[in-house]
């Protein structure tokens, strides 16, 4: 055997000689010398209350959902609660929630983005739910600033307060995250995913805005450049019978008399140009001046 082959064989067996036996690594029970046992997982931190979520249970039907709701009535609303599971699925409930928060165009825009939508019961108000959007690439969480609640009378999801323009929208933040996403999943050594940015409770935030927000004063209307009064109900000329044109050159009567001279149809044409006999009788407005009738049916 050559020296090269001797060195290669020694190098290939040196690692095996340094290894411990199987019984020393996993114990005599799991090494085949006794019964096979599975190591128990360490218990969770007793100080931290365990939150019951829908991820731990697979609800395959309405009866399974009702069974879970009966066993855990205080925890069923914590996450992804469906108000009427016999009528709607989770996918339909998600779409109804987005349509309650935003317009249909914005809701479809959110559904196209790479985010999973979930909703969780608020600790401040049990009737409200906080909607969160989780990135499918990096597991980043974005909370919607507007809470939502279920209205059982009409059977729809409605916003907590009519303050969408004040509290803001999550669509812009989601677009910004989508452009700057690192596309890297968090480390598997961490038991939990990345925590969202700490912020105020959306329910308390909306209450604070509603309490301290003052509506902006309306801007004054821009006046006309010539500052001349327009014909309106406050104008004295508008209440006077007769033609509104004060220039005799543009009065339809003299124009017609100049064009047609002495025509038998001149009064009829003038009456029809001013609005007809009904207009003249009721409103007293004619190009011929004040109404010629008795005025019993005249308004002005």
Swiss-Prot record:
Native source species: Human spumaretrovirus (SFVcpz(hu))
Ranges for region Disordered: 1-50, 209-244
DNA-binding feature ranges: 89-200
InterPro entries: Foamy_BEL
Entry keyword set: Activator, DNA-binding, Host nucleus, Transcription, Transcription regulation
Signal peptide positions (record): none
Compartments it resides in: Host nucleus
GO annotation, cellular component aspect: host cell nucleus
Listed GO MF terms: DNA binding
A UniProt-annotated Pfam family: Foamy_BEL
Assembly and binders: Homodimer or homomultimer. Forms complexes with the host nuclear factors NFIA, NFIB, NFIC or NFIX.
Protein name (database record): Protein Bel-1
Positions with biased composition (Basic residues): 211-222
Compositional bias of kind Polar residues: 10-23, 227-237
Ranges for region Transactivation domain: 224-300
Residue window of motif Nuclear localization signal: 214-223
GO terms under biological process: positive regulation of DNA-templated transcription; viral process
Cited function: Transcriptional transactivator that activates the viral internal promoter (IP), thereby enhancing its own expression. This transactivation is repressed by nuclear factor I. Also transactivates the long terminal repeat (LTR) promoter, thereby inducing structural gene expression, initiating the late phase of infection. It is therefore a key regulator of viral gene expression. It directly binds to and activates DNA target sites of viral promoters and those of distinct cellular genes. Required for viral replication.
Primary site of residence: host cell
């Amino acid at each position: 055997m050559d020296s090269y082959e001797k060195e290669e064989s020694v190098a290939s067996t040196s690692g095996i000689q340094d290894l411990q036996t199987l019984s020393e690594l996993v114990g005599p029970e799991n090494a085949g010398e006794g019964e096979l046992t599975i190591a128990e997982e360490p218990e969770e931190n007793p100080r931290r209350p365990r939150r019951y979520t829908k991820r731990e249970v697979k609800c395959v039907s309405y009866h399974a959902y009702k069974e879970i709701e009966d066993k855990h009535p205080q925890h069923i609303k914590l996450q992804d609660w469906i108000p009427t599971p016999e009528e709607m699925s989770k996918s339909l409930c998600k779409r109804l929630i987005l349509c309650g928060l935003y317009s249909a165009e914005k809701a479809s825009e959110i559904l196209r983005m790479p985010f999973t939508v979930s909703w969780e019961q608020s600790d401040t108000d049990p009737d409200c739910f906080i909607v969160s959007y989780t990135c499918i690439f990096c597991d980043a969480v974005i909370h919607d600033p507007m809470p939502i609640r279920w209205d059982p009378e009409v059977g729809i999801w409605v916003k907590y307060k009519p303050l969408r323009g004040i509290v803001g929208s999550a669509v812009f933040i989601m677009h910004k995250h989508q452009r700057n996403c690192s596309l890297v999943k968090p480390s598997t050594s961490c038991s939990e995913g990345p925590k969202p940015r700490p912020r105020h409770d959306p329910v308390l935030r909306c209450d604070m805005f509603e309490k301290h927000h003052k509506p902006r004063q309306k801007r004054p209307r821009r006046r006309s450049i010539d500052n001349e009064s327009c014909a309106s109900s406050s104008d004295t000329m508008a209440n006077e019978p007769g033609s509104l044109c004060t220039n005799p050159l543009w009065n339809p009567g003299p124009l017609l008399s100049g064009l047609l001279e002495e025509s038998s149809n001149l009064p009829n044409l003038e009456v029809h140009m001013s609005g007809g006999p009904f207009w003249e009788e009721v409103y007293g407005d004619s190009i011929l001046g004040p109404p010629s009738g008795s005025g019993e049916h005249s308004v002005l």
